[in-house]
Amino acid sequence: MGLILFTFLISCQQNTALACSDSLNSLNSLHTEEQPALSGDGQFIAYVSNRNGTRGILLFDLKDQKFIDLPRLNRPDAIAENPSISNTARYIVYVASDRGRADIQLYDRVTEQVQVLTAGYRGWVRHPSISPDGRYITFETGSNGQWDIEVIDRGTIELDVL
């Protein structure tokens, strides 16, 4: 962690391409930015940030250098972590913890809806990952007393098209 912080501080001091201000419109800020996920087309990056004292998932458009609104994704009563995004960032899969339980959730930027994918799972879930087209979601589950891999097939109806 010290190396990452050191690299960030050096980059900020040398005024490189990284945006290193406390601005709400910059990729990086003086607050914690972690758990990055890059879209398959390389245009978007989703990550967890602690800006304004609120921990949540942000989506940044690298091409247009601006944040994308994510209505209904971040809730004040839940902690969102470990984002993974589809090819065009239409879908964001992540872990949300509320009511003392972690669930894998899927956010659709087009419909602005959140779907809980692991409701009713026994045990813990962590580290979700989504396929480029948004059809498959993998994650780790501890429901059998050890960490195992699960795959959810969402079918062919909804593909990653904006």
Give the positions of each predicted feature.
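Sequence signature of WD/YWTD-type beta-propeller architectures
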Residues: I10-L162
